[in-house]
Amino acid sequence: MEKSTVYFTDFRCSVGTSQLDKLKKLCVAAGIKNIDMDGKFVAIKMHFGELGNLAFLRPNYAKAVADLCKEQGGMPFLTDCNTLYPGSRKNALDHLDCANLNGFNPISTGCQIIIGDGLRGTDEVEVPVVNGEYCKTALIGHAVMDADVFISLTHLKGHESTGFGGAIKNIGMGCGSRAGKMQQHASGKPAVREKLCRGCGRCAKECGSDAITYVNKKAVIDYDKCKGCGRCIGACSFDAIYNPNYNANELLDRKMAEYAQAVCYDRPCFHISLVQDISPNCDCHGENDAPILPDIGMFASFDPVALDQACADACLKAAPIANSQLGEHLSQPGWHCHHDHFKDSNPNIEWQATLDQAEKIGLGTRQYELKRI
């Protein structure tokens, strides 16, 4: 497969310009105007942030992309699907309230918001996964599949289960209905290392399913309630909660790539990733830890695999921030350094499996040419 082109611009701005101007220029250079949007519905998939989290992308970025779509005659809307776990985005009403509270509304974004899988997270379409190995079909939010054109607008950050959350995760996990998310997460559930558990209560507080209680000051997981989302793993500061299924995260990664294939296959797609506020964990948390790496820039491509690879490569070349989870890990005596910022931040991950599987099934290629704008 030939190399894909990924376009890049940094966040530096001279007087009289803005990051929004640079984002629009990046998208135009990357070819967004080559997509026929005239009279067509354009889904812009992004994460509105959990309440309390401040690392998500500002709504101004969404407006810049929506404005470009409208200039081309498109009818854009922002979309995301409901979460598997309880929280502020578990149904469409709460999800819309959360989006509004975090600044996303028709005025700030220039378009409407539609929750992709409906009121209860059950408005889904069963979509074939071309070349799928782990998922023959995917359960995708109906509104996502109703769109004529699909654009992903991604905040790249670390992730406690997948290593980092890039375009493929935004598409694959984000566009899955609640049942679709369950299918992806069903590879394994966490367990507790009692010797390491301090009984601090952070995991129980983070669990949206009320699946964690304490016996003799040690965490105990009720597997009848546990959804397998892995939020407790990221919440624990003592490595006391882990996934005993050694390949559970890898299976999650590969399923996620196949779900992204279902969303993108055989229709016009365009992908944008902003590498800033690189927190160690997902924006699904109700908080965000300090960034592990400095802000890097904005990337765009027609190929989500090449895009994720380019973003990952840029992150791996960056110097860690000392006062961060990554910096603290690397400063610990005896810490086993993986020379991989994502793995050194969250050791029990296999992020490259996502890109391997995505390339294998034809979603894109990991080989790319980077063009700076």
Task: State where each predicted segment sits.
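Terminal amphipathic helices with adjacent charged low-complexity linkers/tails
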Residues: 66-67
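Extended, low-polarity segments enriched in aliphatic/aromatic residues
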Residues: 2-61, 71-80, 85-373
